């Protein structure tokens, strides 16, 4: 979708990004959230500040260092691996397009508009997307969702009523494990004691006493 925005700007059929978005909405009429199938939303990630996310270069290096074999494998590993593959390929195509624009677009103002849009708007979206899937593969999806919810609650709480430090993703698994281990076992309601039948030995001793 973002690549098509750029194509519309370059071809001047829609002179602004806002106009291209209107055209896309008219053509497709779809509201696609890439995080919904993973239990998150774009709005949930928007609670994290922009400078929270590492650069695309750092995220790509992290993905390559941790998951290179799985990403290059022809087999399906997980939905997160598939999403990472697509994001990495899209970013590569975007860089190719940006290079072409920088070399061929004559109007300096239009060139600056495209470069700024790529670096700020699209760069942030790719940083969010890469961070989310790398974190889910590293810490687990449930932990990442719990972190996003916790951070969203923290950032929306007035400063006077919230802890001084924001939640930290790397400490959530440990906290979760401690909380699970600290659960008190369920108490079972004691059942009424059944009257035990006398054992044969007890009955034999009683019969002997009666005989005596």
From Swiss-Prot:
The record marks 183-184 as: Cleavage. Phosphorylated. Cleaved by host furin. Gene3D superfamilies: Viral capsid, core domain supefamily, Hepatitis B virus. Pfam families: Hep_core_N, Hepatitis_core. Its main location: secreted. One of its GO terms (cellular component) is T=4 icosahedral viral capsid. GO terms for biological process: microtubule-dependent intracellular transport of viral material towards nucleus; symbiont entry into host cell; viral penetration into host nucleus. Residues 172-212 are annotated as: Disordered. It is found in: Secreted; Host nucleus. Sequence repeats lie at residues 184-190, 191-198, 199-206. GO terms for molecular function: DNA binding; RNA binding; structural molecule activity. Residues 178-205 have a biased composition (Basic residues). The keyword Transmembrane does not apply. Residues 184-212 form a propeptide. May regulate immune response to the intracellular capsid in acting as a T-cell tolerogen, by having an immunoregulatory effect which prevents destruction of infected cells by cytotoxic T-cells. This immune regulation may predispose to chronicity during perinatal infections and prevent severe liver injury during adult infections. Homodimerizes. Belongs to the orthohepadnavirus precore antigen family. This is External core antigen. It comes from Hepatitis B virus genotype D (isolate Germany/1-91/1991) (HBV-D). The gene is C.
